[in-house]
Structures are given as structure tokens and as C-alpha cells.
């Protein structure tokens, strides 16, 4: 085990939320983030129907089950196969939240439209701030799109976002579809983490507008060249710092070209 790995293991052992989650048989320390968010904003209530986007390893599914009780209903979706939880009213589906067939499958499972959609998913981290922020926004905007397809009117939405230049543009976009939007960082988030949570309440029923002039929506428009540049960046072990800087600059230029 390398020095970095040893340091990480030691830090984790000292982490009160990691130890508490282990004692309580929760699958992730992130479980306590949702507990704290709900304590502050009253997002999930007893008997609610909840959908968890990017639910692996299942910590938020467990938290949502504790909040909704036996009469609630929770469905999680993730690209990974999730080990089933011992509750009849918690179901995990392997699939892509952007895939219409997967969404149809979830809608068929649900007893009614969800009251709440939650998303604690993270993109693949490159270690380059600009790229990670962009990937986070792409992922969270896809989560917002999914929320507008599934949520019942008046429903709530919770999503994790990485801070960066366009963070408040994302909050503005969320505000187009919800009556209220808040930003917060729960106590269980690590101090050094760039993550922030957006809490959106009372969905107004509007469907996602792909023709929006929002800078955030522009990020979703496909551009093969941008993908190729980001793929090159993911292999940057063999790329010099100077070349990495040039790639980031190119990504910004390509992003600026989008209509």
C-alpha cells in the first residue's frame, strides 16, 4: 500500500460519519448528508414516492427508506448493479437515467409519480477543475431533465453540484422549473470538497426546454470534437502540463462556439 493509500485509510478511520455509517449498517457516509439536508429543508416526508438517480452504493436509498417508512416507495437507478436492500418498497434498477426505455421501466414500477427526485451522483473525476466542473454540470442538468419528465407537480428535487464559474447559472436554470431553489453544504460534506447541494422545492410542471438560451443547456448539445478533446485529457498521464493547458483552453473555445 502506497503512502497516499495509507493516509486515505487513516483519514477514513478518523471520519466520524464513516464510523457512524459502519455502526448503523449504512452503505455510505453520504447517508448522513441526506439526513441533514432533510432535517433542514423538509424535502422527503412519510409515505412519499422517491426516485434516486445514480443511487450506488445505496446509502441514499437507505436514508430515503428511513424517511418515508413502510408506506413510502423508493426506486433507485444506476449504471452499476446495486445489491438489493431488504425492503419490499425499495427497488434498484440497473440503467441509464437518460435512456427513455429505462425511464419507462421506472415509471411502470412506480405506484404514482414521484414526490421527490434525489441525485448524489458524481461524474468521473479527471483532477482538472474546469473539466470536472463541466462534467458535473452536464450530469446534474441531465438529472434536472429527468426530474421534469417524472416529478409530480409540487414535487421536490435535490442534486449535488461541483462549484465553479457556472454554478449559479445552474441554480438559475433550476429556478425556471421550481418555485424555490436553495444552495447548501451539509455538515457531513468534507470541508475540502467542492460539492454543494441544490434544493429545489415545488415543481411548477414545466417541461425541460432544450431551446433555452441558458449557458448550461448549451453544454448538453453534442459536439464530437469536444468529446475527443476530453478523451485525450483523460489520458493525460502521458501529456505535459503545457499540453494539458492547451486542451483546457480548447475545451473553453469549443464551449463558447456552441449556439
UniProtKB/Swiss-Prot annotation:
Residues annotated to bind S-adenosyl-L-methionine: 58, 60, 78, 96, 120
Protein keywords: Cytoplasm, Methyltransferase, rRNA processing, S-adenosyl-L-methionine, Transferase
Kinase recorded as keyword: no
Location(s) in or outside the cell: Cytoplasm
This protein's GO CC annotations: cytoplasm
Signal sequence segment: none
Keyword Thylakoid carried by entry: no
Enzyme Commission number(s): 2.1.1.166
UniProt GO MF annotations: rRNA (uridine-2'-O-)-methyltransferase activity
Disulfide bridge positions per record: none
Source organism, top-level taxon: Archaea
Residues at the active site: 160
Family membership noted in the UniProt record: Belongs to the class I-like SAM-binding methyltransferase superfamily. RNA methyltransferase RlmE family.
Function: Specifically methylates the uridine in position 2552 of 23S rRNA at the 2'-O position of the ribose in the fully assembled 50S ribosomal subunit.
Protein name per its UniProtKB record: Ribosomal RNA large subunit methyltransferase E
Amino acid at each position: 500500500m502506497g503512502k497516499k493509500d495509507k493516509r486515505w485509510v487513516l483519514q477514513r478511520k478518523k471520519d466520524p460519519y464513516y464510523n457512524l455509517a459502519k455502526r448503523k449498517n449504512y452503505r455510505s457516509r453520504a447517508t448522513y448528508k441526506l439526513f441533514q439536508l432533510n432535517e433542514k429543508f423538509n424535502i422527503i416526508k412519510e409515505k412519499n414516492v422517491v426516485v434516486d438517480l445514480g443511487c450506488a452504493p445505496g446509502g441514499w436509498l437507505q436514508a430515503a427508506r428511513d424517511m418515508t417508512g413502510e408506506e413510502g416507495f423508493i426506486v433507485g437507478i444506476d449504471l452499476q448493479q446495486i445489491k438489493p436492500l431488504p425492503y419490499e418498497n425499495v427497488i434498484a434498477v440497473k440503467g441509464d437515467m437518460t435512456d427513455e426505455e429505462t425511464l419507462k421501466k421506472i415509471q411502470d414500477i412506480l405506484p404514482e409519480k414521484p414526490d421527490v427526485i434525489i441525485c448524489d451522483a458524481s461524474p468521473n473525476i479527471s483532477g482538472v477543475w474546469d473539466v470536472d466542473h463541466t462534467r458535473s454540470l452536464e450530469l446534474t442538468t441531465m438529472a434536472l431533465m429527468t426530474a421534469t419528465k417524472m416529478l409530480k407537480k409540487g414535487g421536490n428535487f435535490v442534486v449535488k453540484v461541483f462549484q465553479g464559474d457556472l454554478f449559479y447559472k445552474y441554480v438559475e436554470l433550476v429556478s425556471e422549473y421550481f418555485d424555490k431553489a436553495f444552495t447548501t453544504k451539509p455538515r457531513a460534506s468534507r470541508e475540502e470538497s467542492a460539492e454543494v447541494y441544490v434544493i429545489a422545492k415545488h415543481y411548477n410542471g414545466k417541461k425541460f426546454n432544450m431551446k433555452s438560451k441558458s449557458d448550461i443547456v448549451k453544454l448538453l448539445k453534442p459536439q464530437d470534437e469536444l468529446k475527443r478533446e476530453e478523451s485525450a485529457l483523460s489520458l493525460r498521464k502521458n501529456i505535459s502540463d503545457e499540453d494539458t493547458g492547451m486542451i483546457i483552453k480548447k475545451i473553453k473555445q469549443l464551449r463558447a462556439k456552441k449556439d
